[in-house]
C-alpha cells in the first residue's frame, strides 16, 4: 500500500513546487530571480560560444534559455490577465526551468572536463551528451 501512495505524493509535491514557482518566485523582487539566472547562463554561453568541444552543450543551453524566457513572458502577460493561465501551465513551466537548469549544469560539467584525459572526464562528457 505504501508504494501506491508514492506517485500521488510525488505528483502533489511537484504541483505545489510548480505553483510556488509561478505564483511567488517568478514575481518575487520584480522577476529578478529569473533575470539573474538568465544573466548567469547568458554570460556562460558568451564565454564558451567558440569552444568547439562543448558546442552541442552550448547550443542546447541557448535553445533552452530562449524557451524559458519566451514562456516566462507568456506567463507574465497571460497570468496577470487570468490567474488560471498561470496555474494551469505551472507544472510544465517547472519542468522547463528544471531541464534548463540541468542543461546548464551539464554544460558547466563539460567545460570543466574539456581537455582532460582521465576516463571519468571523458565519461562525464559522454553522459552529458546523452542527456542534453
Feature map (PLM): residue ranges:
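C-terminal amphipathic alpha-helical interaction region
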Residues: 25-28, 43-132
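Glycine-rich phosphate/cofactor-binding loops in nucleotide/flavin-utilizing enzymes
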Residues: 1-50, 125-132
Amino acid at each position: 500500500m505504501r508504494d501506491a501512495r508514492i506517485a500521488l505524493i510525488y505528483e502533489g509535491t511537484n504541483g505545489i513546487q510548480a505553483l510556488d514557482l509561478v505564483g511567488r518566485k517568478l514575481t518575487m523582487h520584480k522577476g529578478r530571480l529569473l533575470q539573474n539566472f538568465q544573466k548567469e547562463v547568458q554570460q556562460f554561453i558568451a564565454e564558451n560560444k567558440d569552444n568547439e568541444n562543448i558546442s552541442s552543450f552550448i547550443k542546447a543551453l541557448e535553445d533552452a534559455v530562449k524557451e524559458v524566457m519566451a514562456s516566462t513572458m507568456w506567463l507574465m502577460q497571460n497570468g496577470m490577465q487570468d490567474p488560471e493561465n498561470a496555474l494551469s501551465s505551472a507544472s510544465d513551466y517547472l519542468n522547463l526551468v528544471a531541464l534548463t537548469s540541468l542543461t546548464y549544469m551539464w554544460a558547466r560539467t563539460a567545460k570543466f572536463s574539456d581537455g582532460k584525459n582521465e576516463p571519468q572526464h571523458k565519461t562525464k562528457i559522454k553522459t552529458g551528451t546523452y542527456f542534453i
